[in-house]
Amino acid sequence: MSFDKSKIKNVVFIMLDTLQFNYLGCYGNETVKTPHLDRFARQSVLFENAYSEGVPTVPVRRALMTGRFTLPYGGWQPLGSDDTTITDILWGRNMQTALIYDTAPMRLAKFGYSRGFDYVDFCPGQELDHTTFENEPLDPALKPEDFTSATMVWDENGEYIDDESPQLLDEIGCFLRQQQHRRTEADSYVAKVMNRTDSWLRERRDKNRPFFLWIDSFDPHEPWDPPSVWKGEPCPYDPEYEGNPIMLAPWVPVEGRITERECEHIRALYMEKITDVDRWVGRTLDSIREQGLMDETMVVIMSDHGQPMGEAEHGHGIMRKSRPWPYEELVHVPLMMHIPGVEGGQRISSFVQNVDVTATIMDVLDLLDTEDGISDHGMKTFGAEDYQGESLLPMMQGEVDKIRDYAIAGYYGMSWSIITDEYSYVHWLVSEDEKNNADCVEGADKVMSEDMWTCTAGAKIEVPQHNELYDRRKDPFQLNNIAEENPEKAEELLQKLKLVIGELRTT
């Protein structure tokens, strides 16, 4: 089957939140079982160096929906009234659009990330949607302290260690209240999202019209509550563990608070949850195949970011996104694309950013070069003329080897980084001196609050004192800072980073 844009009618975009790239078999992990995603990778194009330019959850969605960088402009904030989204462009073009999701940050008051979709189906109860179940009485048999480690909560005198302790128990209590009626594996959040997706594909959509479907699963984001936790069984990836299942841990550095054995168990639960997500995504892919849609549908599967979970390469000493640190385990993401007529089984090593995904979708739909205008009915229409991404189609078709020489990543107002074939460089912005040196974007009026960069009270704005340089070939997970030994290379990359950020500020 040769590539022909006119034969591609539909797009299915699947976002899996907090899925670390190297926890997938197709990205080299030999422990985690992900057969469905691995099969999809073999039949699709896999991108080995995809990076989220501005993290975490919300700025990634904004970049993907608008085709424009969020770094360095803004962070955790609503869609702007002047943002042109994919659905804005598709409006009036005889293409039905649907959003099926449980990612509650997209649904925060006035955030507007469901804007423009014809059909919206939200599954309540995930993180930041606690109010849905706040009046639900908790089964007395379910105690929050039974789903974490006591030494993370209380000191030797039986007192709370700090303010993180009651917050952790409250957070676990919220999740228990939401999931206490869970009886089967179909009651998990990812199952609900994928089952509702199947229902829309089979029963609700207009089968005479093309469609754009955005599926957004918050799983495998924490809580780490895979099937074994609810069944009261050992985790298959850690059957010898004898403590409480650790559904959640505090937003803290792990040293002195979370043991390495506990970190191992957390990672095992995370792996099990990924395997569960893989199974349900597999069912959605099977549904697409069974309905004969795969030969006329572009399918994208990716994540917004990974997850720090321990020391060294597992998280640089932190748990969850408790610090604004743009290291490899967080900003390097999995990305796979199936495009009918494009050779499957390819692995592309060129750098890719979120905005390139959006540009590719528009290119496949033959809308990348469209401009704002007026329809035949006198209504304003929108185009992709302001996109900052590059289509990946030329690489996938073998016309070019790469579209970028580097990638950028970071947290709004706190950290920037640049990644090249040989090096990665991290520049910290928090101190006033560093802000001045880097000509940092202030933009206080363009973000909800710097304290809300994860929208979690436990997160702290703490960064290292010095910029960092890493040899990607010898040290891919950025454990040995060589900036002092290589000041010229560090300065070269800093200047390159400042130039890139400066160019983004003016476009």
Task: Give the predicted meaning of each segment.
Residues M1-T507:
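Catalytic domains that recognize anionic headgroups
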